[in-house]
Amino acid sequence: MAEGEKNQDFTFKMESPSDSAVVLPSTPQASANPSSPYTNSSRKQPMSATLRERLRKTRFSFNSSYNVVKRLKVESEENDQTFSEKPASSTEENCLEFQESFKHIDSEFEENTNLKNTLKNLNVCESQSLDSGSCSALQNEFVSEKLPKQRLNAEKAKLVKQVQEKEDLLRRLKLVKMYRSKNDLSQLQLLIKKWRSCSQLLLYELQSAVSEENKKLSLTQLIDHYGLDDKLLHYNRSEEEFIDV
């Protein structure tokens, strides 16, 4: 209120003719015109200290209020600009981050799909290899099952013959052991000769009995058929005869 009264008092004094002579000399036009009577009066009557102080205060008050309003306006505009710019930049950064994260997720998803496909291919290959191995095994089994019966019978006869030979050899060894324990070697040799002669005669009888009218079996065939030893019988294959008959 005090400043408002001072301003009113100052304007009232500025309107009076006595004070107009004081204010006008401050303008450049008045100072440039030496023929004006007001300039002479202003030179004779300078501005008082109180008026200068009031003028300074009024100018400062007007300028300060205008500057404050202007500063507030500028600051509000700057704040609006910063607030409007920051969200845009933040949203752009967020969008970029989301895009990068989506790219990373897409790359990981592609890698996972590739790994799954490779694992599936490996499983398929393993299953195929197992299936091929099982198929080959089954084929081998079927082939072995489809062998001709004649071949199986021949294998069976061969095994039976080997068993008989082993049993015969074992029986002879037992006889030899028994005779050695009870008798001397001279008697054993006599028994061997008797057994050889009996075997030779038996083979001759078999040859005459088995052979047909037009076809006669050889001693070699009979010996091979029964699996006898040529050395024990003293048989000569080239001549097809016994040595000590």
UniProtKB/Swiss-Prot annotation:
Bias type Polar residues, positions: 26-48
A GO biological-process term: positive regulation of DNA-templated transcription
Region (Disordered): 1-54
Tree of life domain: Eukaryota
GO molecular function: transcription coactivator activity
Alphabetized UniProt keyword annotations: Acetylation, Coiled coil, DNA damage, DNA repair, Nucleus, Phosphoprotein, Transcription, Transcription regulation
List of residues that carry Phosphoserine: S61, S64
Pfam family, any one: Mei5
Keyword Acetylation: yes
Principal place of residence: nucleus
Residue runs in coiled coils: 149-177
Compartments, as annotated in UniProt: Nucleus
Tissue spec. comment: Widely expressed.
Recorded GO CC terms: centrosome; nucleolus; nucleoplasm; nucleus; Swi5-Sfr1 complex
Entry keyword RNA-binding: no
Biological role stated in the UniProt entry: Component of the SWI5-SFR1 complex, a complex required for double-strand break repair via homologous recombination. Acts as a transcriptional modulator for ESR1.
Similarity comment: family membership: Belongs to the SFR1/MEI5 family.
PANTHER family: SWI5-DEPENDENT RECOMBINATION DNA REPAIR PROTEIN 1 HOMOLOG
UniProt subunit comment: Component of the SWI5-SFR1 complex. Interacts with RAD51; the interaction is weak. Interacts with ESR1 in the ligand-independent and ligand-dependent manner.
Name of the protein in its database record: Swi5-dependent recombination DNA repair protein 1 homolog
Source species taxonomy: Eukaryota, Metazoa, Chordata, Craniata, Vertebrata
